[in-house]
Amino acid sequence: MKILIPISMSCLLFIGCKEEKKETDTKAMEAQREIETVEKEPGSSFEINPVSHASAVFNWGDHTIYLDPVGGAEAYQDYQAADLILITDIHGDHFDVATLEGLDTSNAKIIAPAAVAEKLPEAFNSQVDVLANGESKERYGITIEAIPMYNLREEAKDFHVKGRGNGYVLSYKGERVYFSGDTEDISEMRSLKNIDKAFICMNLPYTMTVEKAADAVVDFKPKQVHPYHYRGRPDVSDVSRFKELVNKGDS
């Protein structure tokens, strides 16, 4: 099966923050939409709206899903209020209480790992579904599975400890979409099955190399892959090289 990699300005590229370090102060990461909304694909109701770096808004059927909303509520003012909010980890480029408090979350369910839920204000308690790695929950007809995300390299293991954060697989009306979160090419990723769209991180030193990301994608063979969570710099994450490696491995 040939993997489609939409790497062009008309498709999804999440441009990362330009800081040299992984910034935990989200005030230094004002989210901006770097490109226009991606149109729905024929036969699919899944629409992608990049915000910045690891954050995005997805429209899927009648549902609106926010992924790791940070950068201030103003970055989301043009979108419908969320039905689902997925939070992957505790770091400031994935989780920001001030942004959440500024959003209209009155009808939203928040899906998060325990490490995130523990940091949420009590006002959100009734809205939160806590998922550990391997657990799942159905909301609005969408099944959300929590997938492990963690580092493998010895020098990077403290960045993302196994069991703390979640990647997610969402299943809805026959489609399956994977969000990797901050991870390396772990066995749990490589063993995924029947993924229609995969959103794969790749940036050093916090996640994985372009080569490892491409190799993992070739292993689990999603129908389509979108690189995200990278810094928009070829010395950190070369998306053209990623596309070349995936195409070569998938030939």
Please place each PLM-identified region on the residue numbering.
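Sec-dependent signal peptide recognition
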Residues: M1-S8
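C-terminal motif of bacterial Sec signal peptides marking the signal peptidase cleavage site
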Residues: L13-G16
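Cap/insert and terminal regions of metallo-dependent hydrolase folds
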Residues: K18-K21, E184-S251
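Core dinuclear metal-dependent hydrolase active-site scaffold
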Residues: E23-Q80, V130-K193
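Divalent metal-coordination and catalytic microenvironments
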Residues: F58, D89, D96, I144, ...
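Active-site metal-binding motif and surrounding structural segment of the metallo-beta-lactamase
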Residues: G71-E118, N194-F199, K221
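Active-site environment of divalent metal-dependent phosphoester hydrolases
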Residues: A73-A75, H91-F95, A117-L120, E135-E138, ...
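Helix-loop-beta element that forms the nucleotide-linked donor phosphate-binding surface
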Residues: L120-V130
